Swiss-Prot record:
One of its GO terms (biological process) is L-leucine biosynthetic process. InterPro entries: 3-IsopropMal_deHydase_lsu, Acnase/IPM_dHydase_lsu_aba_1/3, Acoase/IPM_deHydtase_lsu_aba, Aconitase_4Fe-4S_BS, Aconitase_4Fe-4S_dom, IPM_dehydratase_rel_enz, IPMI_cat. Heterodimer of LeuC and LeuD. Its EC number is 4.2.1.33. Catalyzes the isomerization between 2-isopropylmalate and 3-isopropylmalate, via the formation of 2-isopropylmaleate. This is 3-isopropylmalate dehydratase large subunit. The lineage of its organism: Bacteria, Pseudomonadati, Bacteroidota, Bacteroidia, Bacteroidales. [4Fe-4S] cluster binds at residues 345, 405, 408. GO terms for molecular function: 3-isopropylmalate dehydratase activity; 4 iron, 4 sulfur cluster binding; metal ion binding.
């Protein structure tokens, strides 16, 4: 009667405090430059070493520029954070993939692609989108800086056991509908608090038919529904993705791992605290129109009106519409845009670049659009060039930048100017997220590509 979550959680329990939290063993800690400095400072103050340095992997991503990475970072705060991570990793004997290192990239892209993330693991990082790794059949969630220090010192963390939710999506996804659209659709129905307090398992035929990278996108956005994390049971798709990668088990170790991994699925009689179901046929290419990821709609639909909303909801909705410069009830099709961003830990993988390139091939970037195409890692960048995707993009008028979090958040040079519209494949569209006054519309790589070549919001199915 155990869920996938139960099986992994229970296998990692060290002890449970009566009427209190669980001491949970952690298999993998990822550290980036923004949330780790105080944790390492705390260890120094108390004279504590990192208990299991081989379990910790560090890399800068939030502050890294996406051009001229071989030169010093100009912003003093960003430079200090990146340099501090380098020093901390060296001082404490930790694996560190610095800027320009061939294994560097966004931490939630590098972990899975290097098979540092594996099924059955418990994984934490001082970053909310750590839930991405759950796509591999792991328990993965973001933690605070004090908890990062706790894991560095003890390889354990104190956590209250969350409730479980299963979201089942059955059926076949339609033309032009991607994992990003599935996630945005879920949020539009469940809101940004619909999964608060839960750890979500995604299931159903539509989920099983997603590629590994599609599942990573889906789990990445779990936190935007309020969930503690999201996960997908490992299957042949997972195993084929992992096999032969750099840190994957080899030989007899692979056989032993596979034997265990195949047990990582919810039992047929498993009981979840909540069950939610969706039909894949109801999902079309999505786009957001407001200032939280739950404010999304099918690209052919109109922005909702305030009819039926409570007073508080109306105030919030009107504030969002004012910020975005939209009117209730209007369509976004044909709306002129200024920027397109392909990248982030949500959609910065090779499949995302393949999708984008497939739609822009033989076309040209619209003159009114500034496009930032940012690989999620140097491995993705190398694969782009190996497959000739860079040539397709260059011929269409696009340029590929260097890996990093880039325009997902305004912590580096890639900021959207105030008042400008950005069709972005990232994960958050909060006010000012991409820069003070920036207006963000979240979408899939296909929707972003359609906007990039037409200069306006366009249904990608019209170009496919």
């Amino acid at each position: 009667m155990n869920t996938l979550f139960d099986k992994i959680w229970d296998a990692h329990v060290v002890t449970t405090v009566e009427d209190g939290p669980t001491q949970l063993y952690i298999d993998r800690l990822y550290c980036h430059e923004v949330t780790s400095p105080q944790a390492f400072a705390g260890l120094r103050e108390r004279g504590i070493k990192v208990l299991r340095p081989e379990k910790v992997f560090c890399m800068p991503d939030h502050n890294t520029p996406t051009h001229d990475q071989d030169k010093p970072i100009e912003d003093p705060i960003s430079k200090t954070q990146v340099d501090t991570l380098t020093k901390n990793a060296k001082d404490f004997g930790l694996t560190h993939f610095g800027m320009m290192h061939p294994k560097n990239g966004i931490i939630h892209v590098v972990g899975p692609e290097r098979a540092l993330t594996l099924p059955g693991m418990t994984i934490v990082c001082g970053d909310s989108h750590t839930s991405t790794h759950g796509a591999m059949g792991a328990i993965a969630f973001g933690i605070g800086t004090s908890e990062v220090e706790m894991v560095l010192a003890s390889q354990c963390i104190l956590q209250s056991r969350p409730k479980t939710m299963r979201i089942t999506v059955d059926g076949e996804l339609g033309k032009g509908v991607t994992a990003k659209d599935v996630a945005l659709y879920m949020m539009s129905k469940m809101t940004t608090s619909g999964a608060t307090g839960y750890f979500v398992e995604y299931a159903g035929s539509a989920i099983r038919n997603l590629t590994m990278e599609g599942r990573l996108t889906l789990c990445n956005l779990s936190i935007e529904m309020g969930a503690r994390g999201g996960m997908v049971a490992p299957d042949e798709v997972t195993f084929e993705y992992i096999k032969g990668r750099e840190n994957a088990p080899q030989g007899e170790a692979w056989d032993q791992a596979m034997e265990y991994w195949k047990t990582l699925k919810s039992d047929d009689d498993a009981v979840f605290d909540q069950e939610v179901r969706f039909d894949a046929a109801d999902i079309e290419p999505m786009i957001t129109y407001g200032t939280n990821p739950g404010m999304g709609m099918g690209i052919t639909q109109n922005i909702p009106t305030t009819e039926g909303m409570g007073e508080a909801a109306q105030v919030s909705f009107k504030k969002s519409m004012e910020y975005m410069g939209f009117q209730p009830g209007e369509s976004l099709l044909g709306k002129k845009i200024d920027y397109v961003f392909l990248g982030a830990c949500t959609n910065g993988r090779i499949e995302d670049f393949r999708a984008f390139a497939s739609l822009v091939k033989g076309r040209r970037k619209a003159d009114n659009v500034i496009a930032w195409l940012v690989p999620g890692s140097w491995m993705v960048d190398a694969q782009i060039r190996k497959e000739g995707i860079d040539k397709i993009l260059t011929e269409a008028g696009f340029a590929i930048r260097q890996p990093g979090c880039s325009a997902c958040l305004a912590m580096n040079d890639d900021k959207i100017p105030a008042g400008k519209y950005s069709v972005s494949t990232s994960n958050r569209n909060f006010e000012g997220r991409q820069g003070p006054g920036a207006r963000t519309l979240l979408a899939s790589p296909l929707v972003a590509a359609a906007a990039a070549v037409t200069g306006v919001i366009t249904d990608p199915r019209e170009l496919m």
